[in-house]
């Protein structure tokens, strides 16, 4: 029977080869994609457990299927740990992704066609913050806000001005490519001044919030959404937090039956593991090192003529670089670095002139390399290698030197 096929490699060699190739890539490459990380074996074990066999529509104690006693325990553990981790009164751990979490939060907070303020994509916002190609921009009337063109920092006075002009029902704070601290108290003041709700998407900074390395949005936001991977170092998934009991009920309904059916209890189990790991004091040490590594890289990039640090540097786990002045666009930089065992992604910048498929910049994060064991010395070396490749993008001899150095570095810190 097929269920007896325990030898994955011999049963499905094509798929096994692809997975093995990805394992080799992760071993050999310096991972700088800011939304990626390296999870623990415990997280992977939970996600690969027998819980994947179980359907459990509904919520603990109120399921539409029988035999859910064990998964109720699993989900309640995840909920309780999430609440403890972020100081929330209510947590929904069922969203399959951050986008699913945002979709449900919108359903709970506003109606189709309502006006919403969200961060512009070029300024560092996310697709689900109102991009015209996304469900958010198609379903709701999003008005974008950006950053100050000189400082490239959030301009709270300008955001207030826009809010007063358009009178939004909801303001969305949070970003996917913003390297500085976000003042949630100011966002709360702006929202209150126009009678709007405040939603914070902390997907990128959740790990920092959990340890106090970034201000917690929970005291200010009506609803907080997040992913459970990225800096939180858990499985790919989403979560919604609130301190409002009425909104909590609306959120639960928006997830099930509103936007999802059965929850992925094996993923929820992995979330529970990650939350327990994040509650350990060692996780705070990890996040502290992430920030140190990011700032070490920023210091090195600041020395390179032709590279420009967006917003002048970083307060969190990521930084953005304009590379166009080196005669290479973001997509070309991404492909070039991938060829020398360094992985990052192209990124639009606030004064973007190119298409989203090219971009003028790249985004760099330190979460994964820190999980691998890199400290400031290695982070500086990484920045030097990235810079060397970008500056010498048409010099094959120099690129080969970078490739060898990158392999030597990853060999010193095996996964």
Curated annotation (Swiss-Prot):
Keyword Cytoplasm applies: yes
GO term, biological process aspect, one: glycine biosynthetic process from serine
Residue list for modification N6-(pyridoxal phosphate)lysine: 230
Feature type site, description Plays an important role in substrate specificity: 229
Pathway field: One-carbon metabolism; tetrahydrofolate interconversion; Amino-acid biosynthesis; glycine biosynthesis; glycine from L-serine: step 1/1
Residue positions binding (6S)-5,6,7,8-tetrahydrofolate: 121, 125-127, 355-357
Necessary cofactors: pyridoxal 5'-phosphate
Catalyzed reactions: (6R)-5,10-methylene-5,6,7,8-tetrahydrofolate + glycine + H2O = (6S)-5,6,7,8-tetrahydrofolate + L-serine
Cellular localisation: Cytoplasm
Known EC number: 2.1.2.1
Listed InterPro entries: PyrdxlP-dep_Trfase, PyrdxlP-dep_Trfase_major, PyrdxlP-dep_Trfase_small, Ser_HO-MeTrfase, Ser_HO-MeTrfase-like, Ser_HO-MeTrfase_PLP_BS, SHMT-like_dom
PROSITE patterns: SHMT
Entry keyword set: Amino-acid biosynthesis, Cytoplasm, One-carbon metabolism, Pyridoxal phosphate, Transferase
This protein's record includes keyword Membrane: no
GO cellular component: cytosol
Family matches, as Pfam families: SHMT
MF term (GO), any: pyridoxal phosphate binding
Entries under SUPFAM superfamilies matching the protein: PLP-dependent transferases (SSF53383)
Assembly with partners or alone: Homodimer.
Family: Belongs to the SHMT family.
Function: Catalyzes the reversible interconversion of serine and glycine with tetrahydrofolate (THF) serving as the one-carbon carrier. This reaction serves as the major source of one-carbon groups required for the biosynthesis of purines, thymidylate, methionine, and other important biomolecules. Also exhibits THF-independent aldolase activity toward beta-hydroxyamino acids, producing glycine and aldehydes, via a retro-aldol mechanism.
Name the record gives this protein: Serine hydroxymethyltransferase
Gene name of the encoded protein: glyA
């Amino acid at each position: 029977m097929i269920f007896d096929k325990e030898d994955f490699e011999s049963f499905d060699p094509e798929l096994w080869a692809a997975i093995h190739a990805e394992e080799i890539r992760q071993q050999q490459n310096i991972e700088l994609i800011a939304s990626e990380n390296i999870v623990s074996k415990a997280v992977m074990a939970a996600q690969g457990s027998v819980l994947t066999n179980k359907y459990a529509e509904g919520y603990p104690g109120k399921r539409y299927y029988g035999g859910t006693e064990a998964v109720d325990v699993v989900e309640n553990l995840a909920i309780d740990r999430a609440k403890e981790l972020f100081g929330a009164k209510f947590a929904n751990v069922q969203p399959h992704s951050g986008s699913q979490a945002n979709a449900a939060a919108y359903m709970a907070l506003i109606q189709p066609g309502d006006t919403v303020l969200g961060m512009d994509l070029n300024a560092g916002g996310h697709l689900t913050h109102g991009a015209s190609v996304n469900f958010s921009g198609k379903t709701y009337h999003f008005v974008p806000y950006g950053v100050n063109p000189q400082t490239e920092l959030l301009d709270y006075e300008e955001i207030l001005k826009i809010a007063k002009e358009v009178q939004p029902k909801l303001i969305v704070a949070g970003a996917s490519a913003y390297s500085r601290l976000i003042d949630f108290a100011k966002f709360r003041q702006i929202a209150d001044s126009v009678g709007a709700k405040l939603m914070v998407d902390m997907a990128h900074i959740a790990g920092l919030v959990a340890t106090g390395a970034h201000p917690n949005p929970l005291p200010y936001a009506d609803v907080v959404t997040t992913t459970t991977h990225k800096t939180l170092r858990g499985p790919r998934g989403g979560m919604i937090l609130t301190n409002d009991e009425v909104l909590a009920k609306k959120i639960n309904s928006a997830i099930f039956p509103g936007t999802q059916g059965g929850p992925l209890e094996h993923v929820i189990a992995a979330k529970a593991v990650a939350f327990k790991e994040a509650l350990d004091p060692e996780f705070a040490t990890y996040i502290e090192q992430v920030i140190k590594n990011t700032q070490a890289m920023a210091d090195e990039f600041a020395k390179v003529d032709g590279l420009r640090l967006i917003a002048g540097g970083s307060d969190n786990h990521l930084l953005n670089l304009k590379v166009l002045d080196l005669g290479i666009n973001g997509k070309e930089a991404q492909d070039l670095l991938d060829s020398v065992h360094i992985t990052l992604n192209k990124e639009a910048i606030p004064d973007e002139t190119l298409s989203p498929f090219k971009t003028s910049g790249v985004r760099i994060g330190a979460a994964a390399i820190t999980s691998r064991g890199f400290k400031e010395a290695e982070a500086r070396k990484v920045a030097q290698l990235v810079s060397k490749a970008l500056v010498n993008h048409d010099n094959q001899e120099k690129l080969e030197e970078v490739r060898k150095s990158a392999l030597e570095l990853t060999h010193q810190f095996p996964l």
